[in-house]
Structure formats: C-alpha cells, structure tokens
Curated annotation (Swiss-Prot):
General function of this protein: E3 ubiquitin-protein ligase that regulates cell proliferation. Involved in apoptosis regulation. Mediates ER stress-induced activation of JNK signaling pathway and apoptosis by promoting ERN1 activation and splicing of XBP1 mRNA. Also involved in protein trafficking and localization.
EC number: 2.3.2.27
GO biological process: organelle localization; positive regulation of JNK cascade; protein autoubiquitination
Species the sequence originates in: Mus musculus (Mouse)
UniProt xrefs under CDD domains: PA_C_RZF_like, RING-H2_RNF13
Protein name: E3 ubiquitin-protein ligase RNF13
Taxonomic placement: Eukaryota, Metazoa, Chordata, Craniata, Vertebrata
GO MF entry, a single one: ubiquitin protein ligase activity
C-alpha cells in the first residue's frame, strides 16, 4: 500500500498534465460566444456579435447556415407563424424574436414548435448582450434547438439587409473560447487532488522514517543493560573517541560489547538518538531477540560496503585496544564492576556491605608490567 502511494506521487505531475489536457480539450468544445455571419444577395457580408443561451443545444462546430425570418408575432410569447418552406428538408430557417413580454425559454420553445432550427433573440433599446437562462426545468427539457442573443442595432441591420425576403442568409458560427471559470474550476480540482496526494505521501514518508529510526536506535531499557565502569588510574582506557578527552578519575564509562569504552554523556546520545552501533568499529550494540526485523535490516545494511564501513573488522579493532578498548581478560571483570558503579547513590551502600565482608576475605590486586592483573585471595582471620 505504501509503495503504491509512493509510485502514485512520483507520477503526480504526469497525471496532472494528462487530466488538464483532456479536460481542456473537452471543455473547448463547449462554446460560450458566437458570431453571426450575414450575406445578402450581392454576396456582401457582415459580422454581428452574439451570446449563446445557457439552455438548448449548442451550435455545431461547423456552424449553422439558414435563412432569417422575422417572428410573427415579434415577441414569440405565443405560437408563431411557421417558416415558408417548413416541409422542404433542404431549407433551414432561423427566426428573429424581440425580447420582453415573456421568458426566453417560452420564446425559443415556440420557435422550435413552429419548425425553426434556431432562434435569435434581440435586445430592446440596448446593445448589451444578455446570457439567456431559465428556471423551468420542464420547459428546458423540451428545447432542442440552439439560440443566441444580440443587440438592437445588430437586429435592425439584419432586418434591413439580410432577411430571407431580401435574398440574404446567415451563418451562426460558434467561437471556441471559454471563460475563466471553465479553466479555473478543473484546475482547482486537479490541484486539490495533487495536494491531497502530497499530504498523504508526506505523512506516509514521515511514519516510515520514524519507524525506521526507532528500529535503528537503542531503547532506554536496552541502554541500561550495557555495563558502566568508573574510571580509575591504571585502567586500560585512555581517550574517549567521541570527545577526544582523556579519562579522569571518577568518569563514568559505557562499555560496549565490542570492548570499546566511551564517556556515558558522549555515547548515550549517539546510541539512543543516532544509531545503535559502536562509533568506532560499527559493530551492533545489544541485538535484541524481540527485534528480529531490525536485526535483519541492520545486518543487511552492515554487509553493504560504503564510505562509512570501517577498514578494520570488529575483531581486529578489539585487538588493537585503541581509544580505550578493553581486552577480553578484563571485560568480564568490568562486567562485574559495572553493578557497583551503575549509580553513585548506591556507592555508600555497596562500600558498607564490603566492610562487613572484609573480615572474612580481602582481595589484593597487583598490576603486572605486561598489563595483566593477578588476583590473590588471602584469609584474614
């Protein structure tokens, strides 16, 4: 599921482009403006601007050619006189109707019933173009012919020179252009879909990254299982590989399974916030049995060679004893000491317990020149 969302987001730009082109190509077939080309018997032509109605059929893309007839009565609020060649299928007639007195849909419906193929409604005492509409759904369902609206001066010119009686004819030509809202609405829809997909992708990516980081980091309970050693002069450790400062008496050192030691204040944030590997040898720290998935992922990552891969394997780095590493002979001893130094508040309790037991045995630690420690136990009765 997550993979499919990622693949969908990768192609969001392509999806947006394809949908935009298809929607615009479809909407461009819907004209919102048109022109009337008028021709008289001398083949003189004139163009008049009009505005198609919001109901009825659209003008065909090639235009509609026909003969212009004045409506009788002019307002067409009642049944009008049919065209002279109503029964001749070869002739197409367009009626010119005056505005006012009744609704636009009634005028156009009466023209359709009379046998006209289109209707032209003109304004009265104005050349303003009006978008004709209707709220009567039943009437709108009955209208099948296209209709346009023109100004009064255009209507007067058509009556004077381009009517059927004067040997003229007209062509209603659609103009394939769209207003801003026709472009804006599909654009906003597509942009909204893309934004939703982007938000889904970002949330999915955030959840995946957070889950991956949690698997690659050490939990608090796992960190507490790592031994802590209190540094004393003569110990094998010398310098913290993170802060590059020499250890001082009383410093708390975190001992990792690879025998590398660091300041607790230095290595703890690395293990809990960055990655649960040794900063020097990259060996995994405390692999948990219940975290098999993270172990598998980490092992696969460690097997891949990259610029962060250490030059020496973990076993070799342990033998070099660099940056405060601890030999195997002392790691077990430090594991036993860690319980004594895990918390400073428990030192007094531990020391008092040791005083009670000193009457039975005492431990004498002698440092040998070769760096190894011999333990001699003597009875002090």
């Amino acid at each position: 599921m997550l993979l499919s969302i990622g693949m969908l987001m990768l192609s969001a730009t392509q999806v947006y482009t394809i949908l935009t082109v298809q929607l615009f190509a479809f909407l461009n077939l819907l004209p919102v403006e048109a022109d009337i080309l008028a021709y008289n018997f001398e083949n003189a032509s004139q163009t008049f601007e009009d505005l198609p109605a919001r109901f009825g059929y659209r003008l065909p893309a090639e235009g509609l050619k026909g003969f212009l007839i004045n409506s009788k009565p002019e307002n067409a609020c009642e049944p009008i006189v049919p065209p002279p060649l109503k029964d001749n299928s070869s002739g197409t007639f367009i009626v010119l109707i005056r505005r006012l007195d009744c609704n636009f849909d009634i005028k156009v419906l009466n023209a359709q019933r009379a046998g006209y193929k289109a209707a032209i409604v003109h304004n009265v005492d104005s050349d303003d173009l009006i978008s004709m509409g209707s709220n009567d759904i039943d009437t709108l369902k009955k209208i099948d012919i296209p209709s346009v609206f023109i100004g009064e001066s255009s209507a007067n010119s058509l009556k004077d020179e381009f009517t059927y009686e004067k040997g003229g004819h007209i062509i209603l030509v659609p103009e394939l252009s769209l207003p801003l809202e026709y472009y804006l609405i599909p654009f906003l829809i597509i942009v909204g879909i893309c934004l939703i997909l982007i938000v889904i992708f970002m949330i999915t990516k955030f959840v995946q990254d957070r889950h991956r980081n949690r698997r690659n980091r050490l939990r608090k309970d796992q960190l507490k299982k790592l031994p802590v050693h209190k540094f004393k002069k003569g110990d094998e450790y010398d310098v913290c590989a993170i802060c590059l400062e020499e250890y001082e008496d009383g410093d708390k050192l975190r001992i990792l399974p690879c025998s590398h030691a660091y300041h607790c204040k230095c290595v703890d944030p690395w293990l809990t916030k960055t990655k649960k590997t040794c900063p020097v040898c990259k060996q995994k720290v405390v692999p948990s049995q219940g975290d098999s998935d993270s172990d598998t992922d980490s092992s696969q990552e460690e097997n891949q060679v990259s610029e962060h891969t250490p030059l020496l394997p973990p076993s070799a780095s342990a033998r070099t004893q660099s940056f405060g590493s601890l030999s195997e002979s002392h790691s077990h001893h430090n594991m036993t000491e860690s319980s004594d130094y895990e918390d400073d508040d428990n030192e007094e309790t531990d020391s008092s317990d040791a005083d009670n037991e000193i009457t039975d045995h005492s431990v004498v630690v002698q440092l040998q020149p070769n760096g190894e420690q011999d333990y001699n136990i003597a009875n002090t009765v």
